């Protein structure tokens, strides 16, 4: 319900403030803040118009650590996901439809360091890490290149090299559980929903 409300709010605002209308001047640049998921995060973004249809965006974000429980093969792990996790990158957005310029398709590349730290019932610790290069593909609505307030929503997929798991446990159980943990979390595919508010200038 919240996502639908945010999407409708962004869509309505952008429809009312189209950049071809006289009350909204064209803007070459903008600065934005955003929040995304599935893991809660906050980020900053600078946009520059290569043309009225094409935008290059430079972004940086950090995950908000959350306490999380994970059950894998009958073993419950407790800990924190998103600890000391951040990413940065560059996206290119293109507006292919002349009469619906709020709609855009986006592709990008960046680097990330994602971390999770968990303990099993026997006291063994596990560190999940997914780092290195990632790519993003998706589509969005809003963030037209206008001066003043800009709103937008984006949906897409992030692809990374996949996570690895390290453990301080020296027993066979700990090593086996680390392998199970890695197999369950090594896909490297992450859905992403992002809400953005910015200022064009």
Residue ranges and their predicted role:
Residues 11, 17, 29-31, 56, ...:
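Intrinsically disordered, low-complexity segments enriched in Ser/Pro/Gly/Ala and basic residues
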Residues 4-6, 24, 47-49, 142:
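Generic structural signal for beta-strand residues in well-ordered domains
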Residues 26-29, 72-76, 120-125, 175-182:
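Extracytoplasmic loops and strand-loop junctions of Gram-negative outer membrane beta-barrel proteins
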Residues 22-44, 55-63:
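Transmembrane beta-strand segments that form the barrel wall of outer-membrane beta-barrel proteins
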Residues 1-23:
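Cleavable N-terminal export/targeting peptides
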Residues 48-151, 194, 199:
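Gram-negative (and chloroplast) outer-membrane scaffold detector with strong preference
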Residues 144-201:
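Predominantly the C-terminal beta-signal and adjacent terminal strand-loop region
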